[in-house]
């Protein structure tokens, strides 16, 4: 609350530490505090470069932000959301297929909306499809039998109705027969989960996290999960083992006679 003007040359580590303590007292998130440090350090570097004012913050490291564990839904909840979608009309069948596919493949929302019909060329014979990830990197992923069946039904019963005689390569279409947008996929997830009585804030990434967590819980090798998720580095995938480790720890303390 005591505001005091500080000249750029006076910005030192003691002042920055006091500022961080003040932010923590105000319950500012660690990620925001880390960003503030980076901004101030860059400002000090700019003053040094442009005005010849030596930076006293060169070696000041931003606080380490604890890794947020991804939110995964229980299998029963995923099943409840997917199974609650009626497939009696073209939109319902499309929505159900989108949910099936997000959970079956762990696709990112950007990969899902960019899917083209030709990316399914091996669906019948090999039960796989092509996804194009970050940097347009192609990967082939297996499609589970329920998602596969839903896709086949969608291609026969729903997509032609949505296309309304137009020509189009996009796999998933909106009600005007155009490529579906990310916003509509978000909306589908929000509305369909609310209808199933799941009132948590869900996103397409929730399905991706659930996909990875359930695979690792089921004993899948981390390298396989890395490949399926399209992670360039296995360390990105290792966060899912932390989720599982939490469950292991919980079970241990609940079950071991001398640990309770």
Predicted regions and their residues:
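Conserved catalytic core of the tyrosine transesterase superfamily
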Residues: 1-260
């Amino acid at each position: 609350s005591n505001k005091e003007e500080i000249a750029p040359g006076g910005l030192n580590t003691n002042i920055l530490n006091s500022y961080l303590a003040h932010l923590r007292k105000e319950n500012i998130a660690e990620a925001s505090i880390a960003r503030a440090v980076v901004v101030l350090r860059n400002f000090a570097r700019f003053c040094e470069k442009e005005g010849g004012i030596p930076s006293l913050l060169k070696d000041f490291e931003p606080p380490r932000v604890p890794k947020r564990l991804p939110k995964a839904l229980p299998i029963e909840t995923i099943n409840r959301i997917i199974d609650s979608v009626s497939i009696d009309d073209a939109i319902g069948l499309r929505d159900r297929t989108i949910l099936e596919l997000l959970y079956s493949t762990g696709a990112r929302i950007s990969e899902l909306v960019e899917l083209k019909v030709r990316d399914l060329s091996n669906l019948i014979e090999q039960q796989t499809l092509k996804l194009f990830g970050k940097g347009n990197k192609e990967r082939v992923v297996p499609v589970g039998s329920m998602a596969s069946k839903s896709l086949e039904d969608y291609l026969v019963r729903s997509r032609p109705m949505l296309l309304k005689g137009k020509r189009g390569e996009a796999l998933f279409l909106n009600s005007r027969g155009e490529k579906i947008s990310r916003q509509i996929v978000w909306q589908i997830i929000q509305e369909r989960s609310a209808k199933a009585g799941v009132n948590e804030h869900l996103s397409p990434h929730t399905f991706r996290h659930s996909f990875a967590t359930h695979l690792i819980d089921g004993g899948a090798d981390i390298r396989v999960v890395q490949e399926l998720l399209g992670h360039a580095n296995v360390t990105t995938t290792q966060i899912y083992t932390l989720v599982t480790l939490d469950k292991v720890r919980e079970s241990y303390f609940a079950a071991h006679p001398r640990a309770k």
